[in-house]
């Protein structure tokens, strides 16, 4: 283990730094390391420039690698959900991991968290470390109740899984076996491609695999395949789609000859195996569920919403897409996404199935968008954006996109600029997606320096509407009072989301009665102060999992007083070897802050420290009180004259022990990393028993008990000559020289305990005990609801660009924080509204669960359109994607209105049930689909050819020919029927 000198630490730093830059290669193994441990290691080796001053400091020594913070279950070594790279963990290649283990070892009983690098993508390949393995449930055909769970990499093959199952269930090598993929209640699929990977096979989280072996008669218990038929004669097998049988029957006989272990037809990447529930054939078209392939509810929700968008579904059901497939578009997917989507829609609307398994479609999406290739939870809206863009490019009627020179408005009328922008758009983008989903908005930017105004008109496929952000957040903190007898108390405080530490102190003050300026806020981790916050630091740096301790102090930390605040760590000494006299130390317990006079004797400092710990340090004298606790008179400790409220008068004899010295406790002064270092002064060393003196003023009448040994010694760490002067004469006087001693996690006083004395006198259970304030059980009241119009108004509100996303002003020739305003110019036949419920920052992830009240019918958008000739703009709701749960997880479902019967249904993966309009508006609503009323007919399908021809005029506000005849008569009627949202 390397605790060694600066050279060794420099070597560690340089070697690990280089290995962190190792490129990912398919099949390589990388290791997860808890980011908190890694940050501590970086401090110890001086990895970053701001860590140099702590380099080699034994008090920031990280100890053995500890990944317990990443584990949900230490027994199974399963990871917590939704861990984020670099925020929660660091990835290191094998060589880097081995080096760290050789230097620091691993916490006992912990296994390394090793993960493989997998390759994703079809055209643009990229590698990623597969942090979350696929958990599969394994069982035998003869006993499906005996389920064994194992985790596999997506790169593992079916053959590897079979071998693992043979081992688990003790199946002899001579026994023939075959594997089945079992899902839903009674649906099986043969896994007869041993070389296929888990990713190729589309196996998902929680999938159950069944291993079957031949019986004593040499027969398969699940049945055999008749040679005269291409249809499996298994009563327990689901019905397989005819397309899959015809595609695979020709390979049947040759497959049997090649491998007798697998007697069912082979299949092409599991593509065409779509099953219906046995015994159900006559379903209503469109009321077809989608099997969850393992965290794919986000995809199922998106598909159900698109499936119930009438003009798009009619387009695919009528095979119009076949004439418009663009196989050569470099921005498209060679038509594969469109064809796969069409096949899925036809199955869903065939009326043959109560549910289908969208594995083929999922595979195609993963090939072209690697971010969706796994089986982790994803964002439904992000998938919708990809699908709409992918379908558009696959079906783009423009075969060769012309170059378009974009022009600024330059003061021209909006109508002219809008018409020009739309015409330019459809010269390059002309598809069914443009016809149905694309609209136009106006963007106005104003330079704050030169007042340059830039106006552009841009197309959109959906509207992302902001929700008013939560202005507050709840934080749980622990308050440590000056009274040493008071246990720490846990509080829940409500603080501004965009606030600072002073806001936290003010909120805590209202509950505790302690003045904010008498508080110091800290983050404690691994027995040390991870951070000591300044009052002006942002609260966003405090994460939910941080242990925040707020210490009451008797002084304002920023004032020049005759007292100083010192961080105190507790250390337990140990000897490296039985024959070595060199000692090390390890941290334990909770650190604390103590206020002491700038000028203080060593004895008095010792007494103050011991009195500060009197709640959990037992009596050190046989004549102490019977309860065994150190005598603390509350009247003295609270109302006394000393710092922290502790009376300055006190006999050192009460704070010492008659324990005899032994070999393990003779060395009371721990050597610093560098014996000549000026940053660490040792106090209370070997000669303390001879010099336990205090000042003349405070020691009158006190006996000097030099024969008694102290419970601990102490050392000042990272306090240089400009901070502290330690006069090692007869008085042993300590003088803090700086007017404002710096208070941070780097400079502290370490109390070194002998193991035997610690075991006898230090009560760790009492030290960790705390109380709960009633605020902990308080649930903040949330706003009842807001209206959809509030979100639209927020979308069109003028805003100032942030410093991280400035606008380049062509006039100033510089990036400026311009003001920006968006306005709606024209709206599409189907308006997709994305409610921006998720917010992200460097330190925080959050979901807004505000109830947004949106109309089911008659959504009038005329209020928000600045185009006077926009035409009809009343909409009816046709679908909603719902998200339940929090960030990074949860569950997606959908409400949708069937185009044939006009009724609402609830789609929850493979389940479909009737729904009422009262159920639709909820806090879970995430993406809304509205269809314009003038495009709705009896079948839900409108003449798309008309929309194609008149798309440009509709987008720019020019009325259709048919509209001109009826606008005067119908507009008034239509507006009367609309429920205005203002």
From Swiss-Prot:
UniProt GO molecular function: cysteine-type deubiquitinase activity; cysteine-type endopeptidase activity
GO CC, one annotated term: nucleus
Active site: 297 (nucleophile), 891 (proton acceptor)
Domain USP stretches: 288-933
Keywords for the protein's UniProt record, in alphabetical order: Cytoplasm, Hydrolase, Nucleus, Protease, Thiol protease, Ubl conjugation pathway
Pfam families, per the entry: DUSP (PF06337), Ubiquitin_3 (PF14836), UCH (PF00443), USP7_C2 (PF14533)
PROSITE patterns noted in UniProt: DUSP (PS51283), USP_1 (PS00972), USP_2 (PS00973), USP_3 (PS50235)
Signal peptide range in chain numbering: none
Annotated localization: Cytoplasm; Nucleus
GO biological process, one term: monoubiquitinated protein deubiquitination
Domain of life: Eukaryota
Compositional bias ranges of the Acidic residues kind: 655-672, 962-975
Domain DUSP: from-to ranges: 7-118
EC class: hydrolase
Region annotation (Disordered) ranges: 623-695, 950-982
Catalytic activity: Thiol-dependent hydrolysis of ester, thioester, amide, peptide and isopeptide bonds formed by the C-terminal Gly of ubiquitin (a 76-residue protein attached to proteins as an intracellular targeting signal)
The keyword Protease is assigned to this record: yes
InterPro entries attached to this UniProt entry: DUSP-like_sf, Papain-like_cys_pep_sf, Pept_C19_DUSP, Peptidase_C19_UCH, Ub_carboxyl-term_hydrolase, Ub_USP-typ, Ubiquitin-like_domsf, USP_C
EC assignment: 3.4.19.12
Cited function: Hydrolase that removes conjugated ubiquitin from target proteins and regulates various pathways such as the TGF-beta receptor signaling and NF-kappa-B pathways. Acts as a key regulator of TGF-beta receptor signaling pathway, but the precise mechanism is still unclear: according to a report, acts by promoting deubiquitination of monoubiquitinated R-SMADs, thereby alleviating inhibition of R-SMADs and promoting activation of TGF-beta target genes.
Family as reported in the entry's similarity comment: Belongs to the peptidase C19 family.
PANTHER family the record matches: UBIQUITIN CARBOXYL-TERMINAL HYDROLASE, UBIQUITIN CARBOXYL-TERMINAL HYDROLASE 15
Name of protein: Ubiquitin carboxyl-terminal hydrolase 15
Species whose genome carries this gene: Xenopus tropicalis (Western clawed frog)
């Amino acid at each position: 283990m390397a605790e060694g000198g600066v050279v060794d630490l420099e070597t560690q730093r340089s070697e690990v730094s280089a290995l962190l830059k190792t490129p990912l290669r398919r099949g390589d193994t990388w290791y997860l390391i808890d980011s908190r441990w890694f940050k501590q290691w970086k401090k110890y080796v001086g990895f970053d420039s701001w860590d140099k001053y702590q380099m080699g400091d034994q008090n920031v020594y990280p100890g053995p690698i500890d990944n317990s913070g990443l584990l949900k279950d230490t027994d199974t070594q399963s990871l917590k959900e939704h861990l984020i790279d670099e925020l929660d963990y660091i990835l290191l290649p094998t060589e880097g991991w081995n080096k760290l283990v050789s230097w620091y070892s691993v916490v006992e009983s912990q296994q390394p968290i090793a993960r493989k690098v997998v390759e994703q993508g079809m055209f643009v390949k990229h590698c990623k470390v597969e942090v979350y393995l696929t958990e599969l449930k394994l069982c035998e055909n003869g006993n499906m109740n005996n389920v064994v769970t194992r985790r596999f990499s997506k790169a593992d093959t079916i053959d590897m899984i079979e071998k693992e199952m043979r081992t688990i269930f003790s199946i002899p090598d001579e026994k023939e076996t075959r594997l089945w993929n079992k899902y839903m209640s009674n649906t099986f699929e043969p896994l007869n491609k041993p070389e296929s990977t888990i990713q190729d096979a589309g196996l998902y989280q929680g999938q159950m695999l069944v291993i079957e072996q031949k019986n004593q008669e040499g027969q398969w218990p699940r049945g055999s395949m008749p040679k005269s038929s291409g249809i499996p004669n298994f009563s327990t097998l689901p019905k397989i789609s005819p397309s899959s049988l015809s595609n695979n029957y020709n390979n049947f006989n040759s497959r049997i000859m090649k491998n007798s272990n697998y007697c069912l037809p082979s299949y092409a990447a599991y593509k065409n195996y779509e099953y219906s529930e046995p015994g159900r054939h006559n379903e209503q078209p469109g009321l077809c569920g989608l099997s969850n392939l393992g965290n794919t509810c986000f995809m199922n929700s998106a598909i159900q919403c698109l499936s119930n968008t009438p003009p798009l579904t009619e387009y695919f059901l009528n095979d119009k897409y076949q004439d418009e497939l663009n196989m050569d578009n470099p921005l498209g997917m060679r038509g594969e996404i469109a064809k796969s989507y069409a096949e899925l829609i036809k199955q869903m609307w065939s009326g043959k199935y109560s549910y289908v398994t969208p594995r083929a479609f999922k595979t195609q999406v993963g090939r072209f968008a690697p971010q969706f290739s796994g089986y982790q939870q994803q964002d439904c809206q992000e998938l919708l954006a990809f699908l709409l863009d992918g379908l558009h490019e696959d079906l783009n009627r423009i075969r060769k996109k012309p170059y378009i020179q974009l022009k600024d408005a330059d003061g021209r009328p909006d109508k002219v600029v809008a018409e020009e922008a739309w015409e330019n758009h459809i010269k390059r983008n002309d598809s069914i997606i443009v016809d149905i989903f694309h609209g136009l908005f106006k963007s106005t930017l104003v330079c704050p320096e030169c007042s340059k105004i830039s106006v552009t008109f841009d197309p959109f496929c959906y509207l992302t509407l902001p929700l008013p952000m939560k202005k507050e957040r709840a934080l749980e903190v622990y308050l440590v009072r000056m009274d040493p007898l008071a246990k720490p108390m846990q509080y829940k405080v409500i603080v501004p989301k965009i606030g600072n530490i002073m806001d936290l102190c003010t909120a805590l003050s209202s509950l505790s009665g302690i003045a904010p300026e008498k508080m110091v806020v800290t983050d404690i981790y691994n027995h040390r102060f991870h951070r000591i916050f300044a009052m002006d630091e942002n609260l966003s740096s405090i994460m939910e999992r941080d242990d925040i301790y707020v210490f009451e102090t008797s002084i304002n930390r920023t004032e020049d007083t005759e007292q100083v605040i010192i961080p105190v760590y507790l250390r337990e000494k140990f000897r490296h070897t039985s024959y070595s006299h060199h000692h090390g130390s390890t941290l334990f317990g909770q650190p604390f802050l103590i206020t002491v006079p700038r000028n203080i004797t060593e004895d008095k400092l010792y007494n103050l420290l011991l009195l500060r710990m009197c709640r959990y340090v037992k009596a050190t004298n046989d004549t102490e009180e019977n309860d065994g606790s150190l005598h603390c008179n509350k009247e003295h400790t609270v109302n006394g004259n000393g710092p922290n409220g502790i009376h300055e008068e006190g006999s050192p004899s009460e704070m010492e022990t008659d324990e005899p010295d032994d070999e393990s406790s003779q060395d009371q002064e721990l050597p610093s990393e560098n014996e000549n270092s000026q940053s660490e002064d040792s106090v209370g060393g070997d000669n303390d028993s001879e010099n336990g003196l205090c000042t003349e003023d405070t020691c009158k009448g006190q006996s000097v008990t030099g024969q008694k040994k102290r419970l601990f010694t102490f050392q000042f760490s990272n306090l240089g000559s400009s901070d502290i002067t330690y006069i090692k004469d007869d008085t042993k006087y300590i003088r803090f020289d700086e007017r404002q001693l710096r208070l941070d996690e780097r400079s502290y006083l370490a109390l070194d305990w002998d193991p035997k004395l610690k075991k006898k006198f230090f009560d760790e259970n009492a030290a960790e005990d705390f109380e709960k304030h009633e605020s902990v059980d308080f649930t903040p009241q949330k706003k009842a609801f807001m209206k959809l119009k509030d979100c639209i108004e927020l979308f069109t509100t003028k805003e100032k660009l942030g410093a991280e996303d400035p606008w380049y002003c062509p006039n100033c020739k510089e990036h400026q924080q311009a003001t920006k305003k968006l306005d709606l110019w024209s709206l599409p036949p189907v308006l997709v509204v994305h409610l921006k419920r998720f917010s992200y920052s460097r330190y925080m992830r959050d979901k807004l669960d505000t109830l947004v009240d949106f109309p089911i019918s008659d959504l009038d958008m005329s209020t928000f359109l600045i185009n006077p000739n926009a035409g009809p703009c009343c909409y009816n709701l046709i679908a909603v994607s719902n998200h339940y749960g929090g960030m990074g997880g949860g569950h997606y479902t959908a409400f949708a209105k069937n185009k044939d019967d006009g009724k609402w249904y609830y789609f929850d993966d493979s389940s479909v049930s009737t729904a009422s309009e009262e159920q639709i508006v909820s806090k879970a609503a995430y993406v809304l689909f509205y269809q314009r009323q003038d495009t709705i007919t009896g079948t839900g399908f409108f003449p798309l050819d008309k929309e194609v021809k008149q798309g440009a005029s509709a987008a720019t506000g020019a009325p259709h020919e048919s509209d001109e005849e009826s606008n005067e008569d119908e507009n008034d009627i239509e507006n009367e029927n609309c429920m205005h949202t203002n």
